[in-house]
Amino acid sequence: HINAQIMQLHHSEHHAAYVNNLNVVEEKYQEALKKGDVTAQVALQPALKFNGGGHINHSIFWTNLSPNGGGEPKGELLEAIKRDFGSFEKFKEKLTAVSVGVQGSGWGWLGFNKEQGRLQIAACSNQDPLQGTTGLVPLLGIDV
């Protein structure tokens, strides 16, 4: 269970800041493109990655939440977890270990590897988006 105050902070302050900052950076980037200012375009890349990633990651995070969530998944997802991790319990242990192993800010992820047709656990630093960083399709994100 995550309390309402934490969720309100995450939505109204953290996620909102990523969106607002991304909008500002995108405007500056468009100006740099129009001017042909490659130096400015390159200089804006870290802010695009951080704020764009923060927006992407938190948008995924909100879709993962449910007022009656928790417990084991059902159907194809549970079968894929058992196939790729041995059991739901082993999956939780591995995802927890990877997530708590993130130093500083970051994310623990369950993703789908399209090339291998299997689930994978990964971590990303800061607000680096999973798909843009690893190529995995994000299924579940844990903000650490």
From Swiss-Prot:
Matches recorded under SUPFAM superfamilies: Fe,Mn superoxide dismutase (SOD), C-terminal domain (SSF54719), Fe,Mn superoxide dismutase (SOD), N-terminal domain (SSF46609)
Cofactor section: Mn(2+)
Cofactor note: Binds 1 Mn(2+) ion per subunit.
UniProt: Mn(2+) binding residues: 10, 58, 143
Domain of life the protein comes from: Eukaryota
3'-nitrotyrosine, modified sites: 18
Any one Pfam family match given in the protein's UniProt record, by short name: Sod_Fe_C
GO molecular function: manganese ion binding; superoxide dismutase activity
Assembly and interaction partners: Homotetramer.
Protein name listed in UniProt: Superoxide dismutase [Mn], mitochondrial
